[in-house]
Design a protein with these regions (language model features):
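A membrane-cytosol interface segment of integral membrane proteins
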Residues: 282-321
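Membrane-embedded catalytic scaffold of the fatty acid hydroxylase/desaturase
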Residues: 80-92, 102-104, 114-288
């Protein structure tokens, strides 16, 4: 019995390690080797434009960032959330296809079969655009809620508690937020897929390159890994009204209250521009990161996992007196 239990734990750990490592070779993931390389090229461009005297390697991999306590929290949460994906999220990914099927069924029962169906090319283009825009819009809206609603902020605060940024800070999120994000992705995928399945007579497909949504692929190539970094890559002013640049996202992480709740878009800056939360790179100088002067509150995996619950406990305890 004990041996079987140990074997189960070993298999789960092995699966978690393999899933974590797979991110570097999965073209759908931001830290795929190709996107890391293009981010390094863009970082070299920023380096050459600056007056930094140290070597490029020292500029890109400073010990104070990559070996900081903040970074090790990033690494541990990246691994821990891989475990959460296997145990809690992975088994339910298939619900996206169920939602798509029942959305298609609902439309068919309610309106009958469409008199005219979208062509393959139309479906290919429109489905890809719809998935990209709606995913980004709802990502923005949920992100907005994370910042505006105290209950959700206590969980999202974990992401903002990073005092140094590196590409793995992308995965520095509380498991509760991870679950919310995955529910959002599953719902958007299911509903949009079901609608297009209905209107295309089941000829649904999307524009992909290397198995990745082509718009997501372009986004990842354009230095997505520099969003969580010390490399201040800025886009031309006109482009920053459309797409969030890496430095604009770094502004979002600033511990300056002036920039709290700014630049919350995932890919597109349009939502920020429309709702008044957009800040352009040129208007901002030096920034630093974090949410609390006492950084020891967030310097370990366990502290980050328990932080929201401790806050709720003290809130309830205080209000029961």
């Amino acid at each position: 019995m004990l041996f079987e239990y140990i074997k189960e734990i070993y298999n789960l750990l092995e699966e978690t390690i393999l899933l974590s490592l797979s991110y570097f070779v999965n073209a759908n993931k931001r830290i795929h080797i190709l996107y890391l390389l293009t981010s390094m090229l863009l970082a070299f461009y920023v380096y050459k434009k600056s007056s930094i005297k140290s070597s490029f390697i020292k500029y890109l991999f400073p010990k104070k960032i990559w070996l900081s306590k903040s970074a090790f929290v990033d690494y541990s949460l990246f691994f821990f959330n891989s475990l959460i994906k296997i145990v809690l999220i992975g088994p339910y990914i298939i619900f996206g296809f169920y939602i798509a099927f029942y959305t298609d069924e609902f439309l068919t029962v309610t309106f009958g079969f469409p008199k005219e169906s979208l062509g393959i090319t139309q479906t290919l283009v429109l489905y890809t655009i719809a998935l990209t825009i709606l995913n980004d819009l709802f990502s923005y809206l949920i992100h907005l809620c994370m910042h505006k609603l105290p209950f959700l902020w206590e969980f999202h605060k974990i992401h903002h508690s990073a005092t140094f940024l590196n590409p793995l800070t992308q995965y520095r999120i509380h498991p509760f937020e991870l679950i919310i994000n995955n529910i959002r992705s599953i719902l958007i995928f299911g509903i949009v897929t079901g609608i297009f399945d209905y209107f295309s007579a089941h000829q649904i497909d999307k524009l992909v390159f290397l198995g990745v949504n082509v718009f997501h692929f372009i986004f990842l190539l354009l230095g997505a890994n520099l969003r969580h970094s010390h490399v201040k890559l800025k886009y031309p002013k006109f482009l920053e009204y459309i797409l969030i640049s890496p430095f604009q996202h770094q502004i979002h992480h600033s511990n300056n209250p002036k920039y709290f709740g700014k630049n919350m878009g995932s890919k597109f800056a349009l939502w920020d521009w429309m709702l008044g939360t957009l800040v352009l790179s040129k208007s901002v100088g030096r920034i630093s990161f974090g949410v609390d002067k006492d950084t020891s509150k967030f310097d370990s995996l366990l502290k980050n996992l328990l932080s929201p619950f401790k806050t709720f406990f003290y809130f309830v305890k205080r209000n029961l007196k």
